Amino acid sequence: MKKMMMALGCAVVIVATGCGRTTNTDTKTKEEVMMNATNDTALSSHCARLFAAAKEADVPTVVEGGTFMPTLYVATEKGGTMINLAGPESIDALRDMAAQTMREKVPDATAYLLDYASFYEKDGAHKGALVMEIADKADAAAKVFVIICNRDEKSVYDPVRHEDVKSLFK
């Protein structure tokens, strides 16, 4: 992935949403959440582990987020962009809203990354397939990357445990 990202010339966007939930951070402020995401010692959180692995692999990284809402993270040649998708009540509405937003705000996107937890798990959607459908509806020529880590320390897209997360950046 690292070589592919470098070839595309875009940053890796590390997800900060839900950061540190294992330490009961539902009441934390956005600043506290971001502090946890960027603190090398806060490895109890999924995004801190991803962030540390990316840094170790010398991958250019932008940390975005800190909300507790469905959010799509977009990597462009100029850096990372966060699109907040709170509101839609259905997968179809969410997909349409995301596609329209991407067409309007990030037409030059080179990669998309999707948050792990709050993206409508209750609907049972396969998130890897969903983000590709969104990119397709947005007429994006982008290569789609998905990094999704669950609180049970495995990905719903591709079974990767946290201790093996460095392999994502090789």
Feature annotation, model-predicted:
Residues 1-8:
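Bacterial N-terminal signal peptides that target proteins for export
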Residues 11-12:
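Repetitive helical segments and hydrophobic/amphipathic motifs
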Residues 15-18:
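C-terminal motif of bacterial Sec signal peptides marking the signal peptidase cleavage site
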Residues 20-31:
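Bacterial Sec signal peptide processing site at the extreme N-terminus
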Residues 46-61:
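Phosphate-interacting basic helix/loop segments used at nucleotide- and nucleic-acid interfaces
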Residues 63-87:
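N-terminal interaction modules that seed assembly of large macromolecular complexes
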Residues 82-122:
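Mature extracytoplasmic domains of secretory-pathway proteins
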Residues 110-170:
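Low-complexity intrinsically disordered segments
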